[in-house]
Amino acid sequence: MAKKILYQDNARRALERGMEIMVEAVSVTLGPKGRNVVLEKSYGSPQIVNDGVTIAKEIKLLDHIENTGVSLIRQAASKTNDVAGDGTTTATVLAYAMVKEGLKNVAAGANPISIKLGMEKASQYLVTQINEFAQPVEDIQSIQQVASISAGNDEIIGSLIADALSKVGKEGVISLEEGKGIVTELEITEGMKLEKGFISPYFITNTEKMEVSYDNPYILLTDKRITLVQQDLLPILEQITKTKRPLLIIAEDVEKEALATLILNKLRGIINVVAVRAPGFGELRKQMLEDIAILTGGTVITQDAGLSLDNIQLNLLGQARRIIVNKDSTTIVSDGQTLNEINIRCEQLRKQVNIADTGYEKEKLQDRIAKLSGGIAVIRVGAVTETEMKDKKLRLEDAINATRAAVEEGIVPGGGATLTHLSENLVTWAKNNLKEDELIGAMIISRAILAPLRRIAENAGINGPVIIEKVQQQEFEIGYNAAKNTFGNMYTEGIVDPAKVTRSGLQNATSIASMILTTECIIVDDVKSSNES
């Protein structure tokens, strides 16, 4: 296929046009008075969302060059979502504001490489400032505030997540399920999270989240390597196929031939299966498999017990209410049938902790106790329609991620107030520490970081620049409450953002924007020539 090549300002402007289209679609959701976006689906009913990264993933333009701009800015949203789990809309708005400001200066003759250096130095300065101003999250009220803001000012969701975290702890697992009624409920159930993910991405059932999710599965536990399905697994697979239930295999390893056979059976729809390597090493691996067996009511297939894979029955397999497997971890939600056995096992492990010889042994035993007894918080999402259900689930996911981020790195004033206040600090610092085009780069950042507050105000129907000026005249804690159209202390009003979300959004936006500003040429497929041919 022939290629289309654009140089210099033409290239950068084409990228900017694509970015602008996407930012307009995403930024309407920003703030308490942000609107929703309707996404057409190739199957099923349209989806109504208020989540930046979900909207960003749906946008694809006809013009290949403009679409490249969309893809680049989408990276800022996706990376922020991967690191912090929230703040995707803010990252998108920031990246575009930086590009827009930067292009003016590049067109006027400033050196893009020096601008990039200045932007990076300014970003590093702002990150240290954010960390300095961040307040630790210690009480349940702060957790509730963060969760409520992230869920679109939904206080009910906020209190649910705060309740869930207080019950399962900071490291605990919170799982989302579709409820049967219209009320969203919280349930604490037995369960375990393993630090091992699927062996192959071909097992994925949900491509949007890149995860495997099955209800009511059988669980096969073994400390052996599975080499050939025909030799090792065929009898038990035939039994499971008759039940039409999915299967989770946790083994030392699944070798290429066996893995290929399992994937083929999954893709053909013969059996829903996912394979995971057993966690730990050596003796610890066997002990952890025993723990999983107790949780799921199964038996570990091991030669020590005189068991082999080729002659096992269904009664030796474990069972669970639900499993969720991604590339890094496996979450098993128990069906609650083995509560008594779990308590006995935990008591045995506690006794072993008391007589353990080394600190390492104690640490591993305590880790196993925590995994067995910690439990999993299951939030059953209730809604009137399926469309509302999907929107609620996205909001809950954002809120859970934001809350974890807040516990990790603390909170800062929300509603764009933190970056607005730091803009003036940055100007002072840059004038004292940078010069020439590097100073211009820092000034680009200082103006761009006002964009989130401006957009929040505009979405509420208020003049953005006026709000920015008023906020900058106040103390650091004071910001703009768009929901009430008032100014006040962001901490006492509960309008707070996780420092990690603000930090990662800023860093990813700076990274993408500085790369675009240093672009001198774009090469894309020429659609016209391909159509003619």
Curated annotation (Swiss-Prot):
PANTHER family linked to this entry: 60 KDA HEAT SHOCK PROTEIN, MITOCHONDRIAL
EC number: 5.6.1.7
Localization (cell): Plastid, Chloroplast
Gene Ontology molecular functions: ATP binding; ATP-dependent protein folding chaperone; isomerase activity; unfolded protein binding
Oligomeric and partner information: Forms a cylinder of 14 subunits composed of two heptameric rings stacked back-to-back. Interacts with the co-chaperonin GroES.
SUPFAM superfamilies: GroEL apical domain-like, GroEL equatorial domain-like, GroEL-intermediate domain like
Name of the featured protein: Chaperonin GroEL, chloroplastic
Family membership noted in the UniProt record: Belongs to the chaperonin (HSP60) family.
NCBIfam families from the UniProt entry: GroEL, PRK00013.1, PRK12849.1, PRK12850.1, PRK12851.1
Entries under PROSITE patterns matching the protein: CHAPERONINS_CPN60
Biological role: Together with its co-chaperonin GroES, plays an essential role in assisting protein folding. The GroEL-GroES system forms a nano-cage that allows encapsulation of the non-native substrate proteins and provides a physical environment optimized to promote and accelerate protein folding.
Main subcellular localisation: plastid
